[in-house]
Amino acid sequence: MFDSIEIAELQAKVRIRVIDDDEDFLKSLGLLLEMTGWTVRTYKSAKEFLSDENFSTPGCILLDLRMPEMTGLELQRNLITQNKNNLPIIFLTGHGDVDSAVYTLKNGAFDFLQKPTNPLLLNKVIAEASQKSLSTQPKNSQRK
C-alpha cells in the first residue's frame, strides 16, 4: 500500500490514459482522477488514442472493453503487435464476464474491474499499475 507522500510523488511522474466511448463516463472519471491528483488524458475511442498517444510518459491505461470501431480487446492486441505494450492496461467495463477477464489477464492486462467500481480500489490499482510502468521506464523518459 502507498502512503500519501508516495502517491503524490508517483502522481507527479505519470499520466493516466482513459479510453471509453461513453462521453459522460469519460468526463466524470477524468474529473474524479484529476481531483485525486492524477494527470489524465481522455480518449473517446481506441483510434483516437492510437493517433494521439506517444507512449513515452509512464502511467497506465484505463480501457473500456466494448467500444465501436475497435474494442478494448482489439486495442490490447494492437498494442502487443506493435510492441507498444509498455503501459499497463486496466480494463474498466460494465460488460465484463469471467471469460473476458481471463482472456485479458492472460494477454497481459494488469487488472480487470467492473463498472461501477469503488474509487478507493480504482485509485489503488492505478497507483500499482503506474508504479510498475515507472519502474520499467528508462530514467530519461520519465516526466518531470
Named regions from a protein language model:
Residues 1-17, 30:
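Non-catalytic signal-transmission and effector/linker regions of two-component phosphorelay proteins
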Residues 5, 23-41:
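Two-component/phosphorelay signaling modules centered on CheY-like receiver
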Residues 20, 63-64, 93:
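Active-site residues of response regulator receiver
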Residues 44-45, 71-75:
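Acidic catalytic/metal-coordinating carboxylates
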Residues 67:
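Receiver (REC) domain active-site loop signature in two-component systems and cognate sites
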Residues 73-85, 103:
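Short amphipathic alpha-helix used as the core "switch/output" element in two-component signaling
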Residues 97, 113-126:
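C-terminal output helix
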